[in-house]
Amino acid sequence: MGTTCNVVVLISGSGSNLQALIDSQHEGNPARIRAVIANRADAFGLTRAKGAGIPTAVLDHKAFDGREAFDAALMELIDAHAPDLVLLAGFMRILSPGFVRHYHGRLLNIHPSLLPKYKGLDTHRRALEAGEAEHGCSVHFVTEELDGGPVVLQAA
């Protein structure tokens, strides 16, 4: 990866995780966000990125005939930035096996639960309904199994 780790961040919404990533960019931190890509034009995270001077793009999944066509266009857009890592930060799309394989070993997801508990959606509601005493966040490698890749980091 060299001295700098070029990162492309994918979002769908408010970009609160993106903001934490932006705030962590400082001298001494090798990670550099090179682009933020959203699948929704109304994602507030785009405003956060623009405010930080980070290039943005929108690729609306509804404009494509199926997941594979969208993912192919998304790969082309991502690859134009030559990232070392692709980070899903609230990106609310299930990615095709071909996409996952293309970025194998450099595709990470921020998931709002202590995996392997509460994979998928509605993690906070499910944790509350289960009476969990502890809840947290996981960063994991993306594999073809939904929220099933190796966990890199967890915090409660």
Regions picked out by a protein language model, each given a short descriptive name:
Residues 55, 84, 133:
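Residue-level detector of anion-binding/catalytic polar loops
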Residues 1-48:
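N-terminal Rossmann-like dinucleotide-binding module
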Residues 52-53, 103:
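Short, structured coil segments at secondary-structure junctions
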Residues 38-39, 63, 67-68, 81-97:
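N-terminal glycine-rich "phosphate-gripper" loop used for MgATP/nucleotide binding
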Residues 24, 31, 39, 89-156:
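Donor/substrate-binding cores of folate-linked one-carbon enzymes
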Residues 2-6, 71, 75-76, 80-84, ...:
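Active-site-proximal loop/hinge segments within enzyme catalytic domains
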Residues 57-62, 110:
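Short beta->alpha connector loops at strand-helix junctions that form conserved
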